[in-house]
Amino acid sequence: MSVFLSNWDIQSINLWLSKMHHYKDTSKSQRANESYIILQLTYQKIGNGRHRIVFDLNNGYVLKVALTKKGIQCNETEFKIYNHCRADLRKHLCRVKEVGHGWIIMKKMDIKVPVEISNKELNPLKNKFSDAGIKPRDMGNSNIRLSKKGKITVVDYGNFIMY
């Protein structure tokens, strides 16, 4: 049951998850293309990485669907870290709204971080996560956005490690 997704959407995701192992040895673009065909979701695809494909739900939120087993782990990691980290760190993490097996729904954030802000604030923010027992792996310009309040927000923290 989902507030954001229809039963058909969830069935489509489950179908993809049952077939994704067939594509484990393909390139990330081939895997993303195959998932898009099998998923047949009505949402616009806005991107993909090695482990997940991202769709715009057109309501201020995005849907991330796993492309690999590691993608499933990334979704679980984002859910766990968002719900178990300190509040002062949570304000720098993209909000998780809903999660299911192989998928996660998060707030859509699309304001790119200007280089001058990134250069000044990214390393201190990485240190803040590290000091709190969270290793911020893969935290770079492609995985951060600016909140409406001007705060750096990590939109992809599936590779973070919580100690």
PLM features per residue range, with description:
Residues 66-71, 110, 158-159:
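Short beta-strand-loop-alpha-helix junction that forms the active-site gateway
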Residues 135-163:
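Catalytic activation segment of kinase domains across protein kinase-like and atypical kinase folds
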Residues 40-84:
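ATP-binding glycine-rich loop module of kinase domains
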Residues 67, 83-123:
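Conserved structural core of kinase catalytic domains
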Residues 127-134:
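Protein kinase catalytic-loop region centered on the HRD/HxD motif
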Residues 2-44:
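Juxta-kinase regulatory segment immediately upstream of eukaryotic protein kinase catalytic domains
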Residues 55-59, 108, 147:
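Active-site beta-strand termini and strand-to-loop segments that position acidic
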